[in-house]
Design a protein with these regions (language model features):
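N-terminal periplasmic/intermembrane-space "pro-region" immediately following the signal or transit peptide
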Residues: 1-69, 413
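Residues that define the transmembrane beta-barrel architecture of outer-membrane proteins
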Residues: 76-83, 131-136, 185-189, 219-223, ...
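Surface-exposed coil loops of outer-membrane beta-barrel proteins
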Residues: 52, 57-75, 110-139, 143-229, ...
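Residues on the lipid-exposed face of transmembrane beta-strands in outer-membrane beta-barrel proteins
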Residues: 44, 76, 80-89, 137-142, ...
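Outer-membrane beta-barrel proteins
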Residues: 17, 22-37, 84-93, 141-146, ...
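Outer-membrane beta-barrel "beta-signal"
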Residues: 364-366, 401-419
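Transmembrane beta-barrel strands of outer-membrane/channel proteins
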Residues: 44-52, 101-105, 154-156, 205-209, ...
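Repeated loop/turn-to-beta-strand initiation elements of outer-membrane beta-barrel proteins
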Residues: 93-97, 147-152, 200-205, 233-239, ...
Length: 419
């Protein structure tokens, strides 16, 4: 009986198998190709902020102060940071030509100028006398059908270096860290070529006029590049670099300077190696690490001190990031970083300086594109590089305002994204 039952079952299964195999699969709906205008990316936002300097509180001094070694939150008090409009189109197989245009206005835009575009060789940070608007990016691009596709770009564009970017909504924190402010450039003018070798490796390389330079201030060029890796689905890594002479030809400021000065300037290279790692494999959690190392031969600030035989400058640092989305609206982010300015060239201290910084940010999406942030930041230095307010400023032996080893700020910012 058991053998008969088993035979019946086997016969039934064998008969059903062809029927199952012949069952037609549901056809997958083909993705509709994008139109020309659908390939465009629009981005625009407005940001305002107020930063309160807690250092020296209660010691007098009601005037608006400054936050040393900061960039977009350099000024204490209210700041109209940025109004930006961006339109970009990447090259594609169907539409192989692309372009990008980013125009900005506000206090942040004033600090992003390149030489030759609203900035001259004599202009220096914090750029109080320059225009409050900027042509941040303007480029054309094209896709050449070679292998997986060779992408070419020419014009002015944002740097490949760094984890943080100019656009505030695309950062985890409101303030920019020391690596963004002191270690790397913001934009370049020149040409780039990019090629994807595999689904996990891409390379970009090109020739540019230098750091934040659109007019070529020393008749020389720099070389920019990137190795980008995606070894895992949620893990990205990149090695970025820029190398070339960046010092200004003195004849750009004084025509009476001899030609030999330019040759001397062009012989001094500046280079930066930039490593960026990011992981988003844990639900609602973003982790990132940025490491920089830079060096410049015969750095002009150190050379001008007249106290060193070795006038080279070296700087390096790291920044670690963690952000957690508690809800669709609430996010908290922390940043911890260290920056070593071995010669005091990047900080302007003139001596070896170590900087530490801890930042905590609470972000809340108030309504549609309206987002508010509250941020506390503590900066610490082994040297007195931070200004401290006094009702009657003390003077040091060098005739400088008294300074402290730490800086504490609270920032409140509000931005609205239109797209």
């Amino acid at each position: 009986t058991r053998r008969l039952l088993a035979a019946v079952l086997l016969t039934a299964l064998a008969g059903a198998a062809p029927a199952l195999a012949q069952t037609p699969e549901a056809k997958k709906e083909e993705e509709k190709p994008k139109t020309y205008w659908e390939e465009h990316k629009l981005f625009a936002y407005i940001e305002n902020s107020a930063t309160f300097n807690l250092s020296g509180a209660g010691r007098g001094g009601a005037t608006r102060g400054t936050n040393e070694l900061r960039l977009y939150d350099f000024h204490e008090g209210y700041t109209f940071n940025m109004a930006e409009f961006s339109i970009k189109k990447d090259p594609s197989e169907k539409y192989p030509f692309g372009y990008g245009l980013v125009v900005t206005a506000g206090s942040d835009a004033q600090k992003n100028h390149s030489f030759g575009i609203f900035r001259d060789e004599e202009d220096a940070f914090p750029f109080r006398n320059t225009e409050w608007f900027d042509l941040q990016e303007a480029y054309v691009s094209g896709l050449i059908p070679v292998g997986s596709g060779l992408t070419l770009k020419a014009g002015k564009f944002a740097t490949l270096l760094g984890y943080e970017v100019i656009e505030s909504p695309n950062n985890l924190n409101f303030s920019r860290g020391y690596l963004f402010t002191l270690a790397i450039p913001l934009t370049h003018t020149g040409g780039l070529a990019s090629y994807t070798f595999t689904d996990w490796f891409n390379m970009t390389a090109g020739v540019v006029l230098g750091w934040d330079d659109a007019k070529n201030v020393n008749d020389s060029v720099s070389y920019l590049g990137q190795f980008a890796f995606t070894p895992l689905k949620d893990f990205t890594a990149s090695l970025n670099w820029v190398v070339g002479p960046e010092q200004i030809d003195a004849r750009r400021i004084d025509e009476n300077v001899s030609r030999d000065s330019r040759v001397y300037v062009n012989s001094h290279l500046r280079y930066v190696l930039d490593f960026v790692f990011a992981y988003t494999g844990f639900k609602n959690l973003t982790l990132a690490l940025n490491v920089d190392y830079g060096h410049e031969q015969s750095e002009p600030f150190v050379r001008g001190l007249g106290t060193r035989q070795d006038t080279d400058a070296t700087w390096w640092g790291w920044a670690a990031y963690a952000a957690y989305d508690w809800t669709d609206k609430l996010r908290t982010s922390v940043r911890q970083e260290f920056f070593r300015d071995a010669a005091g060239a990047r900080t302007g201290s003139g001596i070896g300086t170590d900087l530490w910084s801890s930042t905590a940010t609470i972000q809340y999406k108030i309504w549609k594109g309206l987002v508010g942030r509250v941020e506390y930041r503590h900066d610490q230095s082994d040297e007195r590089v931070f200004r401290v307010r006094y009702s009657t400023p003390d003077r040091t032996t060098q005739g400088l305002l008294a300074r402290g080893n730490s800086l504490d700020t609270i920032s409140v910012s509000l931005y609205y994204s239109f797209f």
